Amino acid sequence: MVHPIVSTPRLDAAMVRIRPVALALPGVVERPSHGSPTFFTAEGPKGRTFASVHDEREWHEGRLCLWAACPKEVQEALVSGGPERFFVPPYVGHRGWIGLRLDLPSVDWDEVCGIIEDAHTFVVDR
């Protein structure tokens, strides 16, 4: 199934902040996956997904969010410690990924950048 590429004003605004951070990491490439901007550890079949950004207006709870790879214990700590900001995302949550809301009135962009960097390190080191 071909998924249409999602582009909304709020997604585009978030990508202005997220894209430079992710693409500055070693070997990272961006390409759409299931219609959403997605970051991979490398080009081609060896590239593994470590983060993606979703505007869920059409599905789930209407969130604008970052999904990022992390160890299961980190997922559990973040979700239990900040359920208003963090959640277990569909499809990938069972593998330890976290969802971080980007549509709240106050977003800590330094934290977002750190989560992206940690996700990259986690996937590369596996």
What do the predicted segments below correspond to?
Residues 1-126:
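Charge-dense, helix-prone N-terminal extensions
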